[in-house]
Amino acid sequence: MAAVILVFGVLHASPAQAAPTPVYPISGYFIYGSTSDANNLKKLTDIKSVGGDTVITFGSLLKPATLSTIPAGCTISGANCAKAAAAGVSVNRYFTYSDNSSWGSPALLCGRDKTLTNGTTRYTILLLPSEGSGCSSPSNTYDVVVITGGQSSISISLGKIATELGMKYYAGLPAPVKRTDITYLPDLSYQATFSLFTARFLLYQDKVNDVPGLAGFYHHTEMPLSNGAVWDAVLKVYEIQNSRIAQYQPTRSALVSPYIDSRSAFSGKVTVDQAREAVRNIADTADGVDLAIAVQDGMGTGKGAAFFGSESGNSVDQYAAAIVGSGTWGGKYLAPSRDYFAAMAEGVEGTGVELWANLEGMAPATSQNPCDNSLRGQTTKSRMDKQLQQLGNTPRKVISFMWDPYFTCSGTYAPMLERLKTTSNTPVITDSIFYGNGDVLVTGHNLSGGTIQVKWTDAYGRVFDKTVTATSYNATYGKQVGINPLLESVTAKLGSTSLGSGKNYFINVTNGSGVKNDALYSDRG
């Protein structure tokens, strides 16, 4: 696998370069936004201080409703606002929506749309034609959406602050509710209304949030990386919304984050081959939109595993054991996340879609790692380093679920934010090539200015352990070969030797700051 990803190994001879200031190589985070500019400025500034340049928020549900469930405060001349706004037309269905945005006058597009304020609450009523297009229904039948908002908006504030800080923000898209019979699938019984409402959402964002910091939109509806036909309903949601983005926000991109579940004993487990096909299916929904697929690595939920082949017989750690029970990595999981990401890189090849990684920044909860009141717990820096190296060189960008609370909570450990500030210079080895001339190209992060230790077995069965000075440091390796631009490279010159076929070799890097990688790295000849 390494040889496929590192085909540009000749770049190991690039002139030595100065190392960039260390920052942790996670460059984006899911967050909970605020309507307060000050709160958002503090949060995004903290994220930027540890290398983040991107933030993502979740979407909200477009919920079917009845007249009796319309907010009581939404009245027109004392009458239910949905009923009053629909006077003189037939109503197909009612819906409610709330995403902590103000909506109001900028969202009004058609003559029957209305907005009103009751105290600090702003209501916006949209009448969406059940038939036809535009503002009018040939049958005079409409769907009524009542939006509840306030005097300020999370999305507008985050767009503003992201722009000021030179960062990128992905706003969460509306999502359908789940079905009542199959509760993990979206309810597509109102997909036409959902499509129209997505269009109105995008038009509203274009009017109030047309700033450089708004990079695009996040698909709130989630699915596993399964190629089963049952998940076609989720793909349909992606198709609907990507087509609307292409239509109304063509200069902005989209982001989706499916998840790996490689637990051997789980009935819904997904093989590497299925993941390759599934990510291709998601890519095929892009409809011309610049789409990134940020796959969750599963380490925070116990659904995925970070281990090398040389570790397959080792016991799972205490956090994974809380989910899958005692056993070995190779026994409890079908394959390591490294194999999944390599396959998914093949799956998106030629589609124009980017493969990202969503590194889960928490761990399964035990009594030893509480994190506020979350159902997940704090993780360790070394565990995250292991997750990072397992991603290899395939993801174009690494983001993380999620900033709050997992990077900010105190518990057994200090907040991860503080730990990242003090340990961001730890080497992380993501991949390598062992060349026939005895040179070993090592890629990763924080690799400059030190030594490389390589343990290997040659073609004659002789075992070697050699430490050499790291040479040919290339701070822009990732940029030069068109992969993750944060990736660096160094070379270990071992002299004339060979690598035994099928034999594991091991690499450690101690950088110029005297810091050694804290996660085992191995590969096979």
What are the residue ranges of the model-derived segments?
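Substrate-binding cleft of secreted/luminal carbohydrate-active enzymes
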Residues: 36, 47-67, 215, 286-424
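Aromatic-lined carbohydrate-binding surfaces of glycoside hydrolases
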Residues: 35-40, 50-229, 260-269, 297-308, ...
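Beta-strand/beta-sandwich contexts
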Residues: 423-449, 521-525
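Active-site neighborhood of glycoside hydrolase catalytic domains
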Residues: 199-200, 230-263, 276-277, 288-289, ...
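Secretory targeting and sorting signals
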Residues: 1-18
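Short, compositionally biased P/S/T/A/G/V-rich stretches that sit at domain boundaries
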Residues: 258-266, 307, 416-436
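Immunoglobulin-like IPT/TIG beta-sandwich domains and homologous Ig-like subdomains
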Residues: 443-513
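Short, acidic/polar
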Residues: 34-47, 195-207, 270-282, 376-390
